[in-house]
């Protein structure tokens, strides 16, 4: 769980361990006991009814992503704190992203050697791995950019001026993405 679904679908451990029991209760999974040394573990497997339910669920649209991140909330309200506090939060964000990047590198090297812990779904794992790696890189890049911007601000952050070049760059990137998408859809002008 720590290296797979938990990275994008975080839930309390108690909830994660409770859910398979619910699937068994609804006939969507089967539970078998297995001895590991002195301990007994439960192995869950999907039933034919569970496969049908999963296939039906996969045809439905999913909910859009939700971003819930306390450090980003602190960046949002930073004018009520100190510049030093904001810089510290940005550094924590960058360090978090760099640590995840390092984990991603280890996962990717292991994957090249063994196809990972679930070789039967290696192709799907590459899609997920690329997304997570790109996301962590984007966060680290953003945190570095934001740090550079904040370092140029006065200590009284209420007097900071917005980086209009950054806004122009966002507008230009959006226009370029839209043009590329339209060109791909309709061909060159």
Tell me what each language-model feature is:
Residues 87, 94, 98-101, 108, ...:
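Heptad-repeat amphipathic alpha-helical coiled-coil interaction surface used
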Residues 146-164:
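Long amphipathic alpha-helical coiled-coil segments
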Residues 1-68:
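Basic helix-turn-helix/winged-helix DNA-binding cores
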Residues 15, 35, 42, 122-133:
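Alpha-helical scaffold segments that form or flank carboxylate-/histidine-based iron centers
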Residues 160-189:
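Charged, long alpha-helical assembly modules
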Residues 106-128:
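Acidic interhelical loop/turn segments
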Residues 56-111:
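Amphipathic alpha-helical dimerization/coiled-coil segments
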Residues 79, 108-116, 150, 154:
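Secondary-structure edge/capping motif, primarily at the C-terminal ends of alpha-helices
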């Amino acid at each position: 769980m720590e290296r797979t679904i938990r990275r994008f679908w975080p839930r309390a451990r108690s909830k994660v361990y409770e859910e398979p029991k619910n699937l068994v209760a609804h006939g969507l999974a089967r539970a078998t006991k297995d001895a590991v040394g002195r301990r007994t573990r439960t192995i869950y497997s999907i039933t034919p009814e569970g496969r049908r339910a999963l296939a039906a669920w996969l045809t439905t649209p999913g909910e859009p992503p939700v971003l819930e991140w306390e450090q980003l909330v602190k960046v949002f309200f930073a004018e009520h704190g100190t510049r030093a506090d904001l810089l510290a939060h940005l550094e924590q964000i960058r360090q978090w992203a760099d640590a995840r990047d390092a984990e991603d590198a280890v996962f990717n090297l292991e994957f090249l050697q063994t196809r990972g812990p679930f070789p039967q779904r290696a192709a799907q794992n590459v899609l997920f791995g690329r997304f997570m790696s790109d996301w962590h890189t984007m966060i680290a890049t953003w945190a570095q950019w934001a740090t550079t911007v904040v370092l140029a601000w006065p200590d009284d952050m209420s007097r900071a001026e917005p980086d209009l070049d950054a806004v122009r760059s966002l507008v230009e990137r959006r226009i370029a993405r839209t043009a590329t998408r339209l060109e791909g859809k309709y061909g060159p002008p």
